[in-house]
Design a protein with these regions (language model features):
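Long, low-complexity or tandemly repetitive, helically biased scaffold regions used
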Residues: 2-226
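Long, low-complexity, intrinsically disordered segments
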Residues: 221-237
Length: 237
């Protein structure tokens, strides 16, 4: 592996680590947003139940509708988060692919390089596997979030006059948000594993980068042999 190739491989690993870290932050935001939406939904469900039990049924019906409006706001935030998540996961996938391609070009005749590559290859492979596993889980979460969002949008001003319609929308949104919550929890575990492997990979990549720069520095200090000067001729007689 030439010095330039070593540095390029290390850079690709660093980019993968950054992308996975950003994906992890987005997953945490999704967890917080879904948790907030579920709490809003609990409030809506409570007020919906009071509609039949209280003389102030119309008040609680309107209150439940307001909660669903807040739920729509929470759900409106999630598509952008899931889009950001896929952007980071796709970037991580590309960076892992680039790193593996460059590592395959390694000249393992050098024992130091061979040792570095042997350590890095399996770890960067784990990052790729975890990211590949995260994508379908993220897709499921996005689908459930969208269904919950649709359920919250289905409640119109006319629908608020019908407790049955309201309860149905709350039940649908609750079911889908519950599924999304489970998906995102699983997604969090997968991305955590990817992030841990990515950090280990970045640590090894730092060693590769440092060694490559050291070799460059040593090569630049090596004296360049000068061309032999021509032997002076004896003066002609």
């Amino acid at each position: 592996m030439s010095t330039d190739t070593a540095l390029s491989a290390a850079d690709a690993v660093f980019e993968a680590e950054q992308a996975v870290s950003r994906a992890r932050w987005v997953v945490e935001e999704l967890q917080e947003t879904i948790g907030s939406a579920l709490r809003v939904l609990d409030d809506a469900e409570l007020d919906s139940a009071k509609v039949k039990l209280s003389e102030r049924g119309s008040f609680y019906l309107a209150a439940a509708g307001e909660h669903l409006g807040r739920l729509r706001t929470r759900c409106n935030e999630m598509p952008e988060l899931t889009q950001d998540l896929f952007t980071h996961l796709n970037r991580a996938t590309q960076s892992v692919s680039d790193a593996r391609t460059l590592l395959d070009l390694a000249d393992t005749s050098d024992p130091v390089i061979a040792s570095e590559v042997a350590q890095l290859k399996p770890r960067i492979a784990v990052v790729g596997e975890m990211v590949a596993l995260a994508k379908p889980v993220a897709q499921l979460a996005a689908q459930h979030v969208e269904t919950a969002h649709q359920a919250s949008r289905d409640v119109t001003a006319l629908g608020l006059l019908e407790p049955v319609s309201l309860e149905r929308s709350i039940a649908t949104a609750g079911k889908e948000l519950g599924r999304a919550d489970e998906d995102v929890r699983l997604l969090g575990n997968v991305v955590d594993h990817a992030a841990a492997s990515a950090r280990e990979s970045a640590g090894i990549a730092s060693e590769i980068s440092d060694n490559a720069r050291r070799r460059m520095s040593e090569q630049s200090r090596d004296p360049v042999p000068s061309a032999s000067l021509p032997t002076p001729r004896s003066p002609g007689r």
